[in-house]
């Protein structure tokens, strides 16, 4: 009804090739910014692709959202105010042919249904929060309060994560480290920063 979504038939390799062709080589954090190829398809072109049974994803038309919303302004308890031009976000995937909702849409609706009042996540997910705030505004949903905490780094400054098979706090304690040692390793500055917000 709102004209905020469209079908995208591009594969990941086609998207990457289009970004490279346009001379906008993606940085690691920018890789998800879609160049809008299928946004420009005519109704007939879209119908032809559907008739060919091509797989597609549903994308948010961020240009249409930008016209409706303008700038996104929101506050994080720790990081302060963000003012983001909606148009820079990119046409994010909201659903796929085989998966009815994306992480972004699911998280936004789940927070609303469960009446979540505070969302706490790593500061590496601020961009995801921009997307969730946009979806909340478009869907007329009440927004929770957000707190983006500092990331925990190892001694080399690399973020601890499952993806890099970093040691867990449980495994550090099992190796004989005391609570104080683990806190030192995680960074007192980060821990104290979070504790000051809680108190």
Regions found by a protein language model. Give the residues of each.
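A generic structural-conservation signal
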Residues: 8-9, 145, 181, 195
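Proline- and acidic/polar-enriched loop/turn elements at helix boundaries
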Residues: 11-12, 148, 184, 198
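Conserved catalytic-core subdomain
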Residues: 155-199
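Active-site cores that bind ATP or allylic diphosphates and position pyrophosphate for catalysis
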Residues: 2, 7, 13-160, 168-173
